[in-house]
Amino acid sequence: MEELKAKSEIRSLRKKEHIDNFLQGKFQSDNYFQYIYLEHNALPEIDFYEIDTKLNFLGKTISFPLMINAMTGGFQRAVEINKNLAKIAGNFNIPMAVGSQAIAVADKDYEASFKVVREVLKEGLVISNINGFATVDQVARAIDMIEAYGVQIHLNPAQEICMTEGDRNFKGVLKNIENIVRKIEKPVIVKEVGFGISQTVAKRLLEVGVKYIDIGGRGGTNFIEIESWRNEHFHFEELFQWGIPTALSLLQCRAISRDLKIICSGGMKRAGT
């Protein structure tokens, strides 16, 4: 029990440091959307006032093809952060994903910052989040914790390598994802955390039954910079540009299959990002 508490406290501190370090981060990478041009249609043949932005996502109708993606949870200040984010999601009727729930799955004392999202959103579309090493039971518990409509399985090898306490062995993750997809009844979304998903990886995921990919491309939150602030021994400035830019990752993944459902995230700051 003492060992579990110690691990939970380390995780909680790390999550707090992630927010603090993000806020003091200075590095800006680009997501390549500046190289994307939408073709102008001079003959749209539509009535602007008939445009309907609603769509069905994970079995629920949402008002816009937008979502508040996974950010945080697992420390005291995260309760207020997630509460405010959930209010925004509710006001616009868009989905919200929570940050990694691994800490709360292991220790119920840390559930509050995740459960607050469901408390605020009530019937809204909430998505769970946990790592690629999670067991089927852990995934199920993460979903049940917030009555989620689906679950994100996040992939973050670049971040882990830059963490002093991070994982170094990534063997078996694909097989584990395949097992989760087969045994979990809710939709499973495989998500990168800011370094993009390549065409090759998208193809491998599709082959094991993954239907939803969140590309999480380069251009937004930079976890190499965030972890660099935390690492007392090494600074990773030469790797701050690491990753597949969001726009490029989107094109690569879409080329795999028109049936693959893609969430495009990574530096989406404004319209025409």
Where are these regions (language model features)?
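Hydrophobic faces of well-ordered beta-strands that scaffold small-molecule active sites
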Residues: 44, 66-69, 94-98, 125-130, ...
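Alpha-helix-loop-beta-strand connector modules within alpha/beta enzyme cores
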Residues: 110-128, 170-189, 234-262
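Active-site cofactor/substrate anionic-group-binding motifs, chiefly glycine-
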Residues: 56-103
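An N-cap/entry alpha-helix motif that binds or orients negatively charged groups
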Residues: 1-58, 62
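Metal-dependent enolase-superfamily TIM-barrel catalytic cores that perform enediolate-based chemistry
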Residues: 139-196
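Glycine/Thr-rich beta-alpha phosphate-binding loop at enzyme active sites
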Residues: 148-173, 201-253
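Catalytic cores of alpha/beta
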Residues: 135-145, 195-212, 251-258, 262-264, ...
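Acidic (Asp/Glu)-rich catalytic clusters
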Residues: 56-60, 84-91, 114-122, 140-147, ...
